[in-house]
Amino acid sequence: MSDPVFFTAAATGLTLAEIAAAAGTGLPEGADPDRRFSGAASLESAGPDHLAYMDNARYGDALAATRAGACLVSPRFAARCPAGTVALVSRDPYRAYAALLGRLHPDALRPGSQFAVRGVAPGAHVHPEARLEDGVTVDPGAVIGPGAEIGAGTVVGPNAVIGPGVRIGRDCAIGAGTTLSHALLGNRVIVHPGARLGQDGFGFAMGATHLKVPQVGRVIVQDDVEIGANTTVDRGASRDTVIGEGTKIDNLVQIAHNVVIGRHCVIVSGVGISGSTTLEDYVVLGGQVGVVGHLRIGRGSQIAGSSNVNRDVPPGSRWGGTPAKPVRAWFRELTTLARLAERSGKDQAGDDA
């Protein structure tokens, strides 16, 4: 359940008819279309004026016991809704719920000013040569360097540092304590607190002494990208590091110099991508995946969590393991090893007898 201290509900909430229309569902016979809902909550904590959702058999008991006024459910669970809960049947309840949450709690979609600031707050430092469109918000302690450009509707959080010449598009959110240098950001980009974009890539000419290789590329972040807290994106060495449109990156991810990430990729926390690797569109990397440098992971491929990728991955593949391989081969190896270990244990027990 949302805490009103942190999340402001839409002023009038939504009627059941509005919820059904937004979710693309019909209303069951006898349901009151004018019934009003003030917010959304989990099955366990929802009350009569809350919307919930359910699409996992593990929560069947919670659905049967919920007090939610309405619940978005897939067809197979609709009959399990209790009498006091309106079942809104959807083929994708979670996606419908996400869209409705954005309407019930619009301020949760994108971070806003932490100080209810409009314009540039006292205590922020904006260089005279920086260019800010009307409607930019800058929280206390933020620093914006010479030649930086920031588009209308963007919020720069407290103690963020926007380096010289950095360009940020419109309706972006730059979190507290972030640093951006040598970077160009598109529109509607969200950068969460503590992220670092545009610092030196890790490049050295190795020898008796290690000679630093100047990193003279940039970071390019296209529209609708989200970058998690404490993620680091190094600028390119001699070409740009690129993050494609619509890609979502979790917390604590390391993206090295010259990496090119396609459109609508998903990268889960703990991932490390070494230099000059390319991810084509719609690639998914599970948590703690490691990818060595100078590889290509094909469009639509999925890599299981904690895997290590050390060779190119064809488009549309599902790989896992260390080193990563097609999941069928990986599972076959795991099963074979388990059987061998079991057999060895039995043989050892027989010898001991």
UniProtKB/Swiss-Prot annotation:
Active site feature: 257
Q: From the record, give the cysteines joined by S-S bonds.
A: none
What's the superkingdom here?
Answer: Bacteria
Q: What is its EC number?
A: 2.3.1.191
GO BP: any one term: lipid A biosynthetic process
Cite the Pfam families for this sequence. Hexapep (PF00132), LpxD (PF04613)
Instruction: Name the CDD domains on file.
Output: LbH_LpxD
Q: What does the record give as its pathway?
A: Bacterial outer membrane biogenesis; LPS lipid A biosynthesis
Q: What class of enzyme is it?
A: transferase
What catalytic reaction does the record list? a UDP-3-O-[(3R)-3-hydroxyacyl]-alpha-D-glucosamine + a (3R)-hydroxyacyl-[ACP] = a UDP-2-N,3-O-bis[(3R)-3-hydroxyacyl]-alpha-D-glucosamine + holo-[ACP] + H(+)
GO molecular function (one) = N-acyltransferase activity
Listed A to Z, the keywords are: Acyltransferase, Lipid A biosynthesis, Lipid biosynthesis, Lipid metabolism, Repeat, Transferase
**Gene Ontology cellular component annotations, sorted alphabetically:** membrane
Family affiliation: Belongs to the transferase hexapeptide repeat family. LpxD subfamily.
The UniProt subunit note reads as follows:
Homotrimer.
Protein function: Catalyzes the N-acylation of UDP-3-O-acylglucosamine using 3-hydroxyacyl-ACP as the acyl donor. Is involved in the biosynthesis of lipid A, a phosphorylated glycolipid that anchors the lipopolysaccharide to the outer membrane of the cell.
Q: What is this protein called?
A: UDP-3-O-acylglucosamine N-acyltransferase
Q: State the species of origin.
A: Methylobacterium radiotolerans (strain ATCC 27329 / DSM 1819 / JCM 2831 / NBRC 15690 / NCIMB 10815 / 0-1)
This protein's gene is called: lpxD
